[in-house]
Amino acid sequence: MNIENEVHIENASESKREPKPPEGLLEDDTIYITTPYGKISLDGGRIQVKDSDGEIVASFPLEKVCTMNVFGSASVSTPLLKHCSDKEVVINYFTNFGKYFGSFVPSRNTIALVRRHQAGITKEKSLAICREIIHAKLQNSCVFLARKRVEVPSLLKELRDRSLHAVSVDSLRGIEGEAASIYFPMLSSSLPDEWRSDKRTRRPPRDELNALLSLTYTMVNTEVISALRQYNLDPFIGVMHVDRHGKPALALDLLEEFRPVFCDAFVARLINKRMITKDDFTQGSRLNDTAFKKYLGFYHDFMEESLKHPRFKYSVSRKKAIQIQAIIFRKAICGELKGYYPFIYAR
């Protein structure tokens, strides 16, 4: 079976949109409403979206919608809310920047089914997913280093290959930890001398490189959380990271495959192109206010840039690539796919 058909991702022609964000998008059984101050209402058998001037900007067939994701200041009419309650349609609310802040959840809803699958995932399936995630992370780490013309250590390649045969999640954690201790010095060596660091430090990061990495991991993790919420997955029920109060374990799991080719690549760009310099930091290795605003602009542009999806071979933004992984994960745990297919570069 063709995974692209199973996942119902947009095809190449559909991805060629105008530069401005779409007013509305129907994908699989989920719709996205991004119209500023939009009015979302019922019109016969369709969900209708009007802009602030009363013009219709989007329309969706009611029977195909299970989840509505509303961004920014758009409002939902009471008749539509009643319909959503009757038909078990979940509405998720996000800020303009994609930060989740709440949901309308009918007493009977699709969230329960997805969460049941999440909570009931077997150890065997969980291990299989973890293998794919860590293998993808280590392969993507090798790809990142190769793109930076850094010789990839043979032990890193060996650990990558061993990850597919790990017999437990604990052994995978050990493989990932050993690989990280090899990878970070190689990442550091690809940067200008004044930026290099001898080890990864957190809470707090002890130098400017670690500060940029920590900030970027946090930013991309927020994207992952938002994507999981959009597909009614609980970001706090993970397969590899330990469940702890306040820790989005599943988001941290899915973040792993994006760390090298999204997070580390972005930080390397900022440094190598002198978009951010050491003068932009305070004494505590934090970006000053002006530099942080610059950083946010650079980050937004980076996440909206198009790349060729390594599996589907058509252009998507990095933000979209993260959403695709949320779809694939949901379908994998619900039995709609044979397994989890990570975001992984062949070379």
Curated annotation (Swiss-Prot):
Enzyme class: hydrolase
Keywords from the named record: Antiviral defense, DNA-binding, Endonuclease, Hydrolase, Magnesium, Manganese, Metal-binding, Nuclease
E.C. no: 3.1.-.-
CDD domains in UniProt: Cas1_I-II-III
UniProt feature, compositional bias: Basic and acidic residues: 1-21
Entry-linked Gene3D superfamilies: CRISPR-associated endonuclease Cas1, C-terminal domain, CRISPR-associated endonuclease Cas1, N-terminal domain
Summary of the function given for this chain in its UniProt record: CRISPR (clustered regularly interspaced short palindromic repeat), is an adaptive immune system that provides protection against mobile genetic elements (viruses, transposable elements and conjugative plasmids). CRISPR clusters contain spacers, sequences complementary to antecedent mobile elements, and target invading nucleic acids. CRISPR clusters are transcribed and processed into CRISPR RNA (crRNA). Acts as a dsDNA endonuclease. Involved in the integration of spacer DNA into the CRISPR cassette.
Subunit structure: Homodimer, forms a heterotetramer with a Cas2 homodimer.
NCBIfam families: cas1, cas1_CYANO
Stated name of the protein: CRISPR-associated endonuclease Cas1 4
